[in-house]
């Protein structure tokens, strides 16, 4: 029995190491991180999405600090994905269709700096892909200026536990919030 369990554990570790080589992270801010988390967790190849904060200087910020104080942080999601199943460009395209790239005040019913849209790039290739996608969107929308920030990624702080998987864990409250914000209808109007 011990030998059998040892073989199972070894097999698991080998598989995990093989998969770990294909795992990547990327970071997007798009207003309410609950809504962003829901959209990205449904994408094939995405293994996990974590709600959190990025872009500011305050270490380990809380939701109240990010929302009500000038921390410089944005509500951000960390996307953990298998690059063999979905790549950065695919995630970038999904990102655009889940935000209003022309809203400089925030996103939908959430206004303020912490709700602004931001793409955090990790290397020059990602930065170039983001810049190219912005040009394509501005062309598609007859020159309307995209106001989404492009920032170099520095640090990510996970949000409090009650924010994680909020759309699943607090399903009724989340649906009421989402309906009140009319996010889905507004996205349809922008991207149809």
Describe each model-derived feature in a short phrase.
Residues 5-15:
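Bacterial N-terminal signal peptides
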Residues 18-192:
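Flexible coil/turn and secondary-structure edge motifs
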């Amino acid at each position: 029995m011990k030998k059998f369990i040892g073989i199972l554990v070894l097999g698991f570790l080998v598989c995990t190491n093989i998969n770990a080589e294909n795992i990547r992270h990327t970071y997007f801010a798009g207003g309410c991180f609950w809504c962003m988390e829901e959209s990205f967790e449904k994408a094939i190849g995405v293994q996990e999405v974590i709600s959190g904060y990025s872009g500011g200087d305050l270490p380990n910020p809380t939701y109240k600090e990010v929302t009500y104080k000038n921390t410089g942080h944005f509500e951000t999601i960390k996307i953990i994905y298998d690059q063999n199943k979905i790549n950065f460009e695919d995630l970038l395209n999904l990102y655009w269709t889940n935000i209003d790239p022309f809203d400089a005040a925030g996103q939908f019913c959430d206004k303020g700096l912490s709700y602004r849209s931001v793409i955090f790039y990790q290397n020059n290739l990602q930065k170039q892909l983001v810049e190219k996608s912005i040009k394509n969107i501005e062309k598609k929308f007859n020159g309307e200026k995209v106001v989404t920030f492009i920032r170099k990624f520095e640090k990510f702080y996970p949000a409090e536990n009650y924010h994680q998987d909020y759309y699943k864990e607090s399903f009724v409250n989340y649906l009421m919030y989402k309906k009140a914000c009319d996010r889905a209808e507004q996205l349809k109007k922008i991207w149809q």
